[in-house]
Structures are given as structure tokens and as C-alpha cells.
Amino acid sequence: MLRTHTCGELRLQHIGISVTLCGWVQKIRNKGSLVWIDLRDRYGITQLILEEHITAPEILSQVQHIGREYVIQATGSVIERSAKNPSMPTGDIEIEVKSLTILNTAKTPPFLIEEQTDGGEELRMQYRYLDLRRPPLQKNLLLRQLVAQHARAYLEQHHFVDVETPLLIKSTPGGARDFVVPSRIHPQQFYALPQSPQIFKQLLMVAGLDRYYQIAKCFRDEDFRADRQPEFTQIDCELSFVTQADILHIFENFTKYIFEATIQVRLDKFPCITYAEAMQKYGTDKPDIRFGMRLIELTELVKNSEFPLFKQAKLIAGICVKGCADYTRKQLDDLTEYIKKLNLVTSGLVYVKYLADGSFNSPVSKFYDVEQLTLWAKQMHAVPGDLLLILAGEIEATQIALGSLRLKLRDELHLVSKDKFAPLWVVDFPLLEWNEESQRYVSRHHPFTSPKQEDIELLSTKPETVRANAYDLVINGMEIGGGSIRIHDRALQEQIFNVLGFSEEEARQQFGFLTDAFEYGAPPHGGIAFGFDRLCAIIGREDSIRPFIAFPKNNAGRDVMMKAPSTITEQQISELGIILSK
């Protein structure tokens, strides 16, 4: 070993011993006859001291040529610091240097490698190996490792078996686009990278493995949005002979265990609400329940009026913003513009200020008298000083628009703390949704999700009303995990394929291996997958998943460090039998 200790472990009890440290130069303070060097590794920082008449002249001379981020080895004695630094774990001691070796030089970094840096995100991604030297990112990667460690411990304690599934698989329809990989050996044929190990984990249940898990890489060729990664990691799980209630119980306890083991936070029992309730109360299937401001329906109260924006609306609903009756015209205009940009409702944003003296200020006052507005306020649990914001339109569009407005106000008014965690289960999702572009039903989750037993007969008459045996785990408005009870009966699976518009031949070609497997004794089974990157970000109290991924892509899906994606050589193109269109 080139060192005897790390830069984070020496304390007062080590005074008098000779040690050798290795690391990067964080900072140098040169007073001429006295030089201090802060030496850093991933364990911490230790101060080195070099002093005229004590340190050898050749070492003092050598120090004049050392810069930030040089890699050095220093040997010396541990001594007590005269001016202690209580903010550093090693702040009571320093190393009186006896010998020093430069292990490698370093160019001046393009940004500060410190707790707080001056580098922009794109620059730091270009030099990710330098950004990863910074303590916050190293702390995030260590947290990620800790979450994985505890996840494995819990699952293996509960008899789950870790099984690796293939990364080169068959491309199947549905969901996001696949990343495809051309086969050189089989010209004009392609593999796909898995969007999830879904089919393989179901086949493992058919194989009798009973309980499976995997921390799995997944790939989705989606249009890029902020904080989406084309490759991401799932904690993927599947179980045989279970009900939905069993899975919710096991993985609620799993989540509680992870939070307590990693950050010593004890979570209360998770509430469970239906998809319909989530949309009705929060305007989203991923509700943040850390704060109130629930959606309140006003349709029956206001529909019999001459106010044109309300006359044709299927839903009229609003939110009560506590203590914001003093919002300015500009603030209200900004909210109106925000709603307009969502392009969900044709009506504008209607506001009602419930003033401190009990009167109302609203552009709808000419259509509704004080008595009617008082009923609105009562329905919305408003008191003087509150602001009512109301939208009207189609049911789902109005709910979604109000849900988005609710979250915008959450952020503007700083209504929540990242230190508070509010998990809940959302269940009873629609099994199918109608796609206008393709003029067919598509699976809301995937085509292997089981419908609720009592809704199966509706598949042939009202497919859009069928509910799924599906569930999502949501924490602080983020979907952390999702899963379902799967179909294990061939006839029902083929019926679902038919409702989705697959011909018998298409279904056979794409999924025949799965339906064949169901004929050999497939057990009832279900599962769940956690977004591992998102789980780490929530636990780490960050909004973005990027700080918890060692080498992430940017918002355009590019690796700006390796310059990927990139072109390939003509020889590679020729070997793959690919013709590129211009």
C-alpha cells in the first residue's frame, strides 16, 4: 500500500505516530516560511504543515511547484494543531511533513473542485471525472451503494433470488420505442435492449423460482425531457402465489426498511387511494400529499348561470390558496399564462379574492352575487384572506390543469420541505386508454397486467371502464415504483391482445413464447419495479436523479464526455449490412 491511513481517519489519539497519506491537493497556503496543504481523498481532508527550520529545504523547494489537484504522497508525524478547525473531522491534528512525493501533476481544473463549485452543469458533465471528485457527488454515489446494499439484504431475507436476465432481446410492440441493436451474424435482423425484464421475470415464475429480484439496467428510446435518462436502473421484483394486498404489504415494509436503514427516517403507514380519487382530489395520479390545496368540485353550485365560461363545462373545480387574497394583478396574470401554456382547458383562470373584510373581488361578480360567492368559499373551505382559483372544461383536462397549478403554487409558496416524506399507494388504474392517433386501445401499463376479476366481462362491451390490478408507489409527488398482478391464463391474455388490436397471427409472432408457457402450469403471480435512481434522489433529498448516476446523459440524451452517440466507420456499417438514409 502506498499509504498507511486515509485523509479522513486521523484524530488526537494518533498524535506521535508516523503516517503516510496519499491524495489530491485541495488547497495550498504559502506564507513563505510556513506552508499548509489540504490533502483530500474520498474519506476526508487532512492538513499538512511544512515549516522552515523543521522541514527539509528540498521539500520546501518542491512544494513551490505543486498546484491544485496534484496527486501527492506525504509521510510525517501526527501533531496537534495549534488552531483547531471544529468543522473538520480531522481538525484537531495536522501532519508535520518529513517526505513528499509528487505522484502526478495536474492541469488547472476548468471549475472549482469543492463542496460548492462555479462550474455549469454541461461543463461539469463534460469533465464528469473531475466533478465526481467533489464530496457531494461522492456522497451521493455512496448513498446509492448503501440503498442497493439494504435493498438486497431485505429481499434476500425474504427469499428473493437474484437472477440476471438478458440485455439482447426481441423487440416487442407497445410502450416506448426500443433501442435496437443490429446483428452482424444475422444480417437485416435486430436485437432490442430491454425496457424492463418484464417477460423474463414472468417466465421465471412459470419456471417455479417463486421470488425473483434484480437491480436491472433498462433502456427506453423516449423523447427527451428534463431529468429523464435513456438508460436507468430498476429494482425489479416478481412473486408467485400472491395477491395485490400481499405485494403492497411486502413492499411497503421494504420501503420503510430502506428509509430507516439509510437515513434513519421512520415512515408511517402508507395511505391507499384509487386512481379516480387521486385525479379528483389532486389532478394527478402521482399526488404530493405533503400539503393540502385539494381540488374542490363546484359544478353543481355554479352551473346554472349566464357566465359563458361555465355554461358548457363538464367539470368546474378549483383550489383554495391560503392567505393569498393579496395576489397582485401581475401574479394572477402569470398564473393565467401558465394555464394557457398547458393547452388543456379553453376557459381562462377565474379568480375570487376573499378579502379580509369578508367581501369578494372577482371578475365574475357581475354573474354571481355575494351570497353565491359565499357558498363557493364555504365549499372550498376558504376564510377571509384566501384566494380561490377556478377552472372549467372537460373532466380529465380540468383536473390535470388544476393539479399542475397546485404544484406550481407549492413551489412558488415554498409549502413543503424536502425533509418530509409522504408516501402513498395509488390503485385501480384504468387497464386501457384510447389512442386517437392509432384509433385503438393501448395498455396503460403493459399488456400483461391483469384486469380486476369483477371487470373482465366489460372487456367485450366497455373496455375503457375496465380497472387494472395495478398499483403505484408515490412519494412526494414522484412515482417511485409500480407494478401489477399479471395475467397467467392463456385465454385471458389472448383476449387482451385482441382488445389491443393484435391479430391472432401478430400476437402469436410477438408473444407466442409467453402464451405457450402459460399452457405448462403458470402460477398466479405479480410484481413491482422501483425506479432505483429516483428512489436514491428522494432519499438524498434532491430534485434530480443525475447527481446519483456516475455518468449520466444530458437533457438531449448525449454523453458530452464521451461524445456519444456518434457516427461509426464505413467498415462497421458495411459489416452490419445497414444502409443509412441521407
Swiss-Prot record:
GO process annotations (BP): aspartyl-tRNA aminoacylation
Region listing for Aspartate, in residue ranges: 198-201
Subcellular location: Cytoplasm
Gene3D superfamilies: Bira Bifunctional Protein, Domain 2, GAD-like domain, Nucleic acid-binding proteins
Oligomer status and interactors: Homodimer.
Lineage top rank: taxon: Bacteria
Key words of the record: Aminoacyl-tRNA synthetase, ATP-binding, Cytoplasm, Ligase, Nucleotide-binding, Protein biosynthesis
Function: Catalyzes the attachment of L-aspartate to tRNA(Asp) in a two-step reaction: L-aspartate is first activated by ATP to form Asp-AMP and then transferred to the acceptor end of tRNA(Asp).
EC numbers on record: 6.1.1.12
Protein name: Aspartate--tRNA ligase
